[in-house]
């Protein structure tokens, strides 16, 4: 007797889903109506997410390479011995590396990605007029039209995705701003605006920055807020020695919070933020020069909009025997395994590195053609139940006369700034 696919036992259907890679979930859900209904149930999603997060103790990440997104997993053996890190036979047994492409659309190329609570804010390589928010697990998307499009391939705006309601993790908003400061008040231009998912509208924010955030800093999301590396606006040097956050609930920036003072004594020029299980911030400190053989990673022991405290997670000082790898863009922390992972900043841009205690360094060739114009990046990722709210038809909030006037003023200021030679 043949059993129809729709009549398979639930436990068997669940096992099929658990074995399917993220990129194929949508196709499997659409196999039949009952499977699609099951996959959308809250109880099943919770079970699926729990199993995916713990299966084989894998570290799940989203990586961007070649203007495409990948679901990537790295399994680090519990028995990794840092003292044996440079013995090839031992190294080959300690790491398992997997990656699978996930497509928003096979024709759409991604130039940047920002992660918040399982949602991905994607910036398009060939379209500078809009961005898209995507939940890869649910297959939901929300396209957002920008009020002012940047120059193609030269986006100088900074973006952040967050939410107002900290209890339900709802009421999502998109922050967008540009801030140029060239040493004198007349040589500065800033414009801060926020998009509300519920009203489908943009609002200009009243912000006068006393800080400086560099346009190449993409920031990281933590508990609905976004954090960036920053410095005092009036500081004479370019050393980044603080972080700053944007609170989406109050729609305002918090105070400058200090990076760990001990590590700043090493005069690191590059500071990159990441997060640990969406609970803590992590800060990676590196030097510009390739011949430096040290770097530090610190993680927060307490973090909110007003207060921060730090603890050293990992320090590497190899001395002259080996150059410390330079991690490109985002990085991933496995707190239990005491390792950091990311793409190495090299010419070919196809080396993934894992760094641990006592000088442990493992380099993995991803064995793929790599577009050198695309800087690879990686971030932690856990599939999410968060729903992306669609705008109700005919419910778009009308732009007020005040908002129209503020927008026009910002555009006039922008044109004047360009005439002064401001790079935009």
From Swiss-Prot:
Listed Pfam families: F-box, FBA_1
PROSITE patterns membership: FBOX
Stretch forming the signal peptide: none
Domain F-box, first and last residues per copy: 2-47
GO CC annotation: cytosol
SMART domains: FBOX (SM00256)
Name listed for the protein in its UniProt record: F-box protein At2g38590
Gene3D superfamilies (UniProt xref): 1.20.1280.50
InterPro entries given in the database record: F-box-assoc_dom_typ1, F-box-assoc_interact_dom, F-box-like_dom_sf, F-box_dom, Gal_Oxase/kelch_b-propeller, SCF_F-box_component
